From Swiss-Prot:
Region (Disordered): 570-604
ZnF C4-type: positions: 462-485
Membrane topology: Peripheral membrane protein
Full protein name: Arf-GAP with ANK repeat and PH domain-containing protein cnt-1
This protein's encoding gene: cnt-1
Domain PH, first and last residues per copy: 275-373
Organism: Caenorhabditis elegans
Location within or outside the cell: Cytoplasm; Recycling endosome membrane; Basolateral cell membrane; Apical cell membrane
Keywords, sorted A to Z: ANK repeat, Apoptosis, Cell membrane, Cytoplasm, Endocytosis, Endosome, Lipid-binding, Membrane, Metal-binding, Protein transport, Repeat, Transport, Zinc, Zinc-finger
Length: 826
């Protein structure tokens, strides 16, 4: 065995083939033939690499020296990999390699010498010798298959058919004879190739050295001098490396002094990573029924608590708690009969951890408490740096977070250190901000997302007033806002603008893709496409010093009335049309009030308007997502519901001005700018066209960002197409795991059946999409245990769903990277 430059073990020259083994077609013969095939493939690859280098020497004369160096490296690799079994050839190759390397140093002015002879000889060896071996191998494999077929046919002939037996025996004899000759031809070509290999390749390489030496008489003299002086220089180098190796050996003898005198009593040194506050092994009690203790590697990194398995695979760390700001640390209760235990308490669960000693337990508790303190001190700085008019910070759920409430978890943690314990985590946070509970966001990941979103063109200032360094975002509009404008957006209601904090709220991958695809500059180009001259804008544009009423008036005109998204004459015509349609619609509703209430023939139904209940603002994986809906409301018209009447009353834009074809194409390719343009011009995202909706198309094509955009902007999650398929049906059919996760975590009904009486679970099982089937089953399992507030099943289900979603996102990213790489290669 030899070792190549990349550290991989390479097989040496295969053993010679015994002809008797070849006639018998024994397993040993097959194995030896396979080794020779691999050997010649490797040899051909290396020779082709050398030919490419020689061609480069011819074509790029100015880079001759560098290309010659690459050829030298290739010769070294060829010697190590293919000629280690032949000492004479190996020695000769080493001498040639040294000559090539010396040529690089001496002939800096050497341009475009004739390398045709060398190239021709090596090419002839590949085209003649190696091609014969390849053709013989192909004939051998074909005859081997024919031989196997003849043997099977002969073995299956009945004794009762002597004629067939004779015919089969004759055929077997003929095929066997032909196979034997083909095998021997193959062996002969292999042996001939090995015989010609040494002298042909050596002769080709020596030709280049000989011609170079003849062309440069001075170089020939230099070669003689170099040969005489070479041994001493190499010996000195070896002695230098030997001295360095002995020094390293002596240093390695002192490594045992690093072992501490008291193991498992104190943290083992400072963390290597600068952003890691503390790290080490802890035991974590699982939440399953067995309550097993598992040893995991924990880190307090980027103000998050992470843990990972001890394995040879470098897997990404799992985030135990993304937002330590809403957590507290306390010693374990007295009923835990294990030393060094402590608890990390969140509003919804309790993590029980164990250190290797009581001193390490105290170190971990202090480190976590310092992290929580740093988080709250950071919040205090943010609140102090805001405008004096905004003494309280309004969170995503609409609850006002005062500075006292922000410190309440920390105060509880401080009480624990003084000996006062908290028995119920839920009661501990009764007075805390409820939005912090639903915002279990990763501080590190939010910071990363914050930086990514801020790098989008236009996001360095507020989208509405131009204030610098905005820290809030309207997730459905895709614009970044200052804190004053975010308050005005929040007053519009979540049906118009859903405001989140870039620093404190969770931004998952799909939402991040939406924000990165839009941005202030492009969204303003859409909503301000028909902005009149500055002196005739009503209401006037705002700036960072504008008062709250002016902000509200401008933002309402921009996003609710969409006054500047379409031309003024178009808005005037569409306003009259909409008033007529509104009156007709009210008349039709009044006339049909005595009937069943909804005309099924107009369009297909939305089964459950989950978004109207505020599910988009709740914890996506909370256990209480299911909203009971009366039977009579399960067939609401997609285009004739009360929500559409409100939209007609509030917007004076004709939805017919937006072409369905452009929306369909945008959903198929994930063009969020086109979708935002259609939405700004009044397109009804729940409208049914040709028996389908925009959400159905985006889901069917696996466009997760488009699905996220549509759901954020009011697309009904359980909408039915002409075959009574919900988007969940289509995602399960196409095997799109991420859209299934998106729909399930927003409360999509997985029990609805289409015209074929099949639920999404039935379709996923038919199409054998294992991950999607698992998602449906664990969701059903979670719903079965929904009555228990802190049952261990919730954590297990969340872990399974998160793992599947993470794996699907990773696979999607890998496929995208491979596609881009293949495109660039083409």
């Amino acid at each position: 065995m030899t070792v190549s430059n990349n550290g991989m073990a390479m097989p040496s020259v295969p053993p010679k083939i015994d002809c008797s083994e070849a006639i018998q077609d024994s397993p040993k013969f097959r194995a030896t033939v396979a080794q020779h095939a691999m050997y010649f493939n490797r040899l051909e690859n290396r020779l082709n690499e050398m030919l490419r280098h020689i061609t480069a020497m011819i074509d790029f004369s100015k880079n001759y020296t560098n290309t010659f160096y690459k050829l030298t490296v290739s010769v070294n690799q060829l010697c190590d990999e293919s000629f280690s079994g032949n000492p004479l050839a190996s020695t000769t190759f080493q001498g040639l390699s040294e000559a090539y390397a010396h040529t690089v140093n001496l002939f800096r002015t050497y341009f475009d010498h004739s390398n045709v002879v060398t190239f021709t000889k090596l090419s002839n060896f590949i085209k003649i010798e190696l091609t014969k071996v390849a053709e013989s191998r192909a004939h051998f494999e074909n005859m081997s298959q024919s031989m196997d077929d003849a043997l099977v046919k002969n073995a299956s002939i009945s004794r009762q058919k002597p004629a067939d037996a004779t015919e089969g025996r004759n055929a077997l004899t003929a095929v066997g004879t032909c196979f034997a000759h083909t095998t021997l031809d193959y062996v002969a070509n292999i042996n001939i190739a090995h015989a010609h290999k040494d002298h042909m390749i050596l002769d080709a390489l020596w030709t280049l050295v000989r011609e170079s030496s003849a062309f440069f008489s001075k170089g020939h003299a230099t070669f003689d001098e170099w040969t005489a002086a070479d041994n001493g220089a190499i010996a000195d180098t070896i002695q230098t490396f030997a001295a360095k190796s002995k020094l390293i050996e002596r240093k390695m003898q002192d490594v045992h002094s690093l072992v501490p005198k008291e193991m498992f009593q104190h943290p083992s040194g400072m963390p290597i990573e600068p952003d890691v506050m503390m790290e080490g092994y802890l035991y974590k009690r699982s939440s399953n029924a067995f309550k097993t203790w598992n040893r995991r590697w924990f880190q307090i990194k980027d103000k998050q608590l992470l843990y990972s398995h001890r394995s040879t695979d470098l897997e990404p760390a799992t985030i135990m708690e993304e937002n330590l700001r809403i957590c507290l640390v306390r010693p374990a209760p007295s009923n835990i009969d294990r030393i060094g235990c402590f608890e990390l308490v969140t509003p919804t669960r309790i993590h029980l951890l164990q250190a290797d000693s009581e001193s390490l337990c105290q170190d971990w508790m202090r480190a976590l408490q310092r992290t929580i303190l740093a988080l709250h001190e950071g919040d205090s700085v943010d609140v102090a740096s805001t405008s004096p008019r905004n003494k309280t910070t309004s969170m995503s759920s609409g609850v006002t977070l005062t500075s006292a409430n922000a410190i309440s978890p920390l105060s509880n943690a401080m009480d624990v250190t003084k000996g006062r314990s908290v028995s119920d985590p839920a009661s501990t946070y009764t007075s805390a901000n409820t939005s912090s509970i639903s915002t279990a966001a990763g501080f590190s990941s939010s910071t990363t997302a914050f930086e990514q979103v801020r790098r989008v063109p236009g996001n360095e200032v507020c989208a509405d007033c131009g204030s610098p360094a905005p820290k809030w975002v309207s997730i459905n509009l895709g614009v970044v806002l200052c804190i004053e404008c975010s308050g005005a957006h929040r007053s519009l209601g979540v049906q118009t603008s859903k405001v989140r904090s870039l620093c404190m709220d969770s931004i998952d991958n799909e939402l991040r893709d939406v924000l990165l695809a839009l941005g202030n500059r492009q969204v303003n180009e859409i909503f301000l496409a028909h902005l009149p001259p500055a002196d005739s804008i009503v209401p006037p544009q705002i700036n960072e010093k504008s008062a709250r009423p002016a902000r509200e008036a401008w933002i309402k005109a921009k996003y609710v009335e969409r006054r500047f998204a379409v031309a003024e004459d178009t808005r005037a015509r569409s306003s009259a049309t909409n008033r007529q349609e509104h009156l007709k619609h009210k008349t039709s509703i009044g006339g049909n009030s005595s009937s069943n209430g909804v005309n099924r023939s107009s369009s297909y139904a939305d089964v459950q308007d989950a978004e109207s209940g505020g599910l988009l603002d709740a914890d996506p994986w909370s256990a209480d997502l299911s909203v009971p809906v009366p039977t009579a409301s399960k067939r609401l018209s997609a285009c004739g519901s009360d929500t559409n009447l409100d939209a007609i009353g509030s917007s004076s834009i004709d939805t017919k001005t937006v072409e369905w074809d452009s929306v369909k194409e945008a959903c198929e390719c994930g063009d969020l700018l086109a979708l935002m343009t259609a939405y700004a011009q009044g397109f009804d995202l729940n409208a049914l066209h040709n028996g389908t909706t925009a959400l159905h198309i985006a889901t069917r094509n696996g466009q997760t960002a488009a699905v996220e955009f549509l759901l954020l902007n009011g697309a009904k999650i359980n909408m039915l197409d002409e075959k009574l398929n919900t988007p969940l049906h289509l995602a399960a059919k196409e095997g799109h795991t991420l859209p299934v996760c998106q729909l399930l975590k927003r409360g999509a009904d997985s029990n609805l059946a289409n015209v074929d009486s099949k639920t999404p679970l039935d379709i996923a099982m038919e199409c054998t999409h294992a991950d999607i089937v698992t998602l449906f089953r664990v969701t059903i399992m979670r719903n079965d245990f929904n009555a228990d507030f802190n049952n261990p099943m919730d954590e297990t289900v969340e872990a399974v769903i998160s793992d599947i979603a993470r794996r699907a996102a990773t696979e999607k990213e890998q496929k995208k990277t491979e596609s881009l790489k293949s495109t660039s290669d083409i």
